[in-house]
Amino acid sequence: KYLGPHGIRVNVLSPGAVQNKQTHSVVKAYNKQVVLGKRMAHPDDISPALIFLFSEASKYVTGQNLIIDGGWTL
């Protein structure tokens, strides 16, 4: 409400776990909870959403929390 009149959009990107150097047991336990693909996200699963938020395609989007976790929080 305060920044919108100045043309400033405020959004949040909330990724779930992203595959990195987690132990096998952590990955296995996490993957059981994921609805899509039964796997942790890869960086290339997250980057398109970030590009969208930076682009003109999201020029009328503000105040949103874009959760990208493969359905883990369902």
Language model: regions and residue ranges:
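A glycine/serine/threonine-rich, flexible loop-to-helix segment
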Residues: 1, 5, 12-35, 45
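Conserved alpha-helical elements of the SDR catalytic core
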Residues: 3, 49-50, 54-57
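Short, small/polar-rich loop/turn modules that mediate ligand/substrate recognition or access, typified
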Residues: 4, 9, 61-63
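Conserved SDR Rossmann-fold cofactor-binding beta-strand/turn motif
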Residues: 9-19, 54, 67-69
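Functionally critical, cavity-lining and gating residues within the transmembrane helices
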Residues: 19, 59, 72
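Short C-terminal tail/terminal secondary-structure segment
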Residues: 33, 51, 62-74
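A conserved structural motif in NAD(P)-dependent oxidoreductases
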Residues: 35-46, 57
